[in-house]
Curated annotation (Swiss-Prot):
Pathway: Nitrogen metabolism. The keyword NADP does not apply. This is Peroxynitrite isomerase 2. Its cofactor is heme b. Heme b binds at residues 172, 199. Belongs to the nitrobindin family. InterPro entries: Calycin, Nb(III)_bact/plant, Nitrobindin, THAP4-like_heme-bd. It comes from Mycolicibacterium gilvum (strain PYR-GCK). Transmembrane segments: none annotated. CDD domains: lipocalin_heme-bd-THAP4-like. GO terms for molecular function: heme binding; metal ion binding; peroxynitrite isomerase activity.
Length: 209
């Protein structure tokens, strides 16, 4: 077999494994359960088809930069739905030590993706809203658009910080499905000088879906 054949075979095996997984749910609730596997559960709302490739559970590693310098982190992102006109989003990350092992908890955010639905402005029908609550004490609203069928760009529109929250600037994020079906992203944030600087980047492999 060639290296190309090996890669195809490996991708097929990964797909076989991830296709059989889903997120755990309680099955005694009267409403549809969340699902991160499009093969299971309720149908995806048609309004979200342009975000379909994001649905799943993603795991991997990335690089970050803060006031103390560069660091590496591990991350899991869960993107699920319950048939409504939004996607659920939960991202958790943890710092890695120099040997690549777990060091400590890091960033965590939860929120929702949806498309703008404004009858008075049909031109906004492809605008994406991403509303996030961060564990470090602030809420952030992004707006953006799909760049193509497998990439999405968003920019901070508004920030609200709690009294105990960290002081942060706005951000720009780019997500995309890349070679091998992985989810990759980069985030730049506004620094104290008012310019966008690299903050986070990661490449995550599909674990569910």
């Amino acid at each position: 077999m060639t290296s190309g054949d090996d890669a195809v075979a490996a991708a097929a095996e990964r797909a076989r494994q991830t296709a059989a997984r889903n997120i755990p749910v309680f099955d005694d609730l009267p409403l549809p359960s969340d699902t991160a596997n499009l093969r299971e559960g309720v149908d995806l709302d048609d309004a979200l088809l342009a975000l379909l490739p994001l649905i799943g559970v993603w795991r991997g590693e990335g690089e970050g930069r803060d006031a103390h310098g560069d660091y590496r982190f591990g991350q899991q992102i869960i993107v699920s739905h319950d048939g409504a006109d939004y996607l659920n989003w939960e991202a958790r990350s943890w710092r890695l030590d120099d040997g690549g092992d777990y060091d400590r908890r890091d960033l965590r955010e939860t929120g929702f993706w949806r498309f703008v639905n404004d009858p008075n402005d049909p031109g906004e029908s492809q605008a994406i809203e991403l509303l996030l609550a961060h564990s470090s004490g602030y809420i952030e609203l992004f707006y953006g658009r799909p760049l193509n069928q497998a990439s999405w760009e968003l920019v901070t529109d508004a920030l609200a910080r709690s009294k105990s929250g960290v002081l942060v600037g706005g951000a720009k994020r780019l997500y995309g499905i890349i070679e091998g079906g992985d989810l990759a992203y980069v985030e730049e944030r506004v620094d104290a000088d008012g310019g966008l600087v690299p903050h986070l980047s990661a490449r995550l492999s599909r674990f569910v879906g």
